[in-house]
Amino acid sequence: MGWGIVPALPGVARAAAKLSGMQSWRASLLWFDPEADGPRPHFESDGLLVTAADAAGVQRVVAVGAYDTLRPRYSDVAVHDRRGRLIAPGFIDLHIHYPQTDVIGSPADGLLPWLERYTFPQEARFADPGHAASVARFFFDELLRHGVTTVLAFGTSHPGSVDALLGEAQARGLRCIAGKSLQDRHSPDGVRDETEASLRDTEALIARWHGRDRLGYAITPRFAPSCSDAQLHGAGALAARYSDVWIQSHVAENLDELRWVRALYPQDRSYLAVYERFGLLRRRAVYAHGIYLDDADRALLARTGAAVAVSPTSNLFLGSGFFDYAAAREAGVTLGLASDVGGGMSFSPFATMRAAYT
């Protein structure tokens, strides 16, 4: 979480107050300035946050700090008094499945039975654009209720599911990166896609959404077992062609899944190595879970710049295991926290952080 602060001379700021739509809020403030201070937080118990519109009409942070220090500089700017409340940057959820919103808390004996029994039947409903739009609205309502303003999200295998999600995010001015799930094998009717059509759909979605307002696209192989070699090869080719898009998938979440991958890909050293072979490890690649990685895998992640989305509530609920934070940090792996709804039990980042501390 962080605010990009636009420098402004006090005299210029006052003169431009009416023209720029300048506003300010008095409250307790928590913020980060990673370029100046790394991960160190800043806190003001009585702070002032000042914003103004840029040339495009987007509100930007002009100043943030102690109320007594900043108020004289912006004395003619109206103040919204929110004392007793905390203002902070929005949270980021690094891995979430919006189509699984309605399967939260559905019990099963591990990941693979859970997918078959609950997830795939629910995701098949997203062939209906009306259903996708309804869930997208509720999904963002819940995220905002819990202070989340940026997500890296899975759609279903239906392109319309991504259109519904990104369209809703755009309407609300939120930061959302999402992708259509690629899964041309080992998936039931209703969610299984066709190899060539899935790649054409992915490229069309990139053209339609990537870089539009605050939106981005993620090439999204569901996980290696759900994708044929041809589909993974095509995904890697798209990742090379569109180097600024994201990649998202799952890796090493569950022991049964791990055994399945070994049977499907005996030529690869590890589950993660499958993605490497198809050109799917690089910066802007995010892999969820990563519970059963070894030292060579962690070194590969650090070398390629790919990141892991740690999903503690999901890992606990589905009985998958515990992530090795110490080994990942020692190897220099980039990490982020994720709710992994609907395997995860809550949209709340605080619930995710509590589970991570367990």
Q: What label would you give each PLM region?
A:
Residues G105-L174, S198-G211:
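Alpha-helical scaffold segments that flank or form the walls of functional sites
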Residues G173, A239-D244, L280-R283, L300-A309, ...:
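Glycine-enriched alpha-helix->loop->beta-strand junction motifs that scaffold or abut catalytic
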Residues L49, Q59, G84, H95, ...:
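Divalent metal-coordination and catalytic microenvironments
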Residues D102-S134, K180-T195, N254-R284, T304-A307, ...:
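Active-site gating loops and adjacent loop-to-helix segments of metal-dependent hydrolytic enzymes
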Residues G160-G290:
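Metal-coordinating catalytic core of metallo-dependent amide/deamination hydrolases
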Residues M1-R73, R85-L86:
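N-terminal metal-binding scaffold of metallo-dependent hydrolase/deaminase domains
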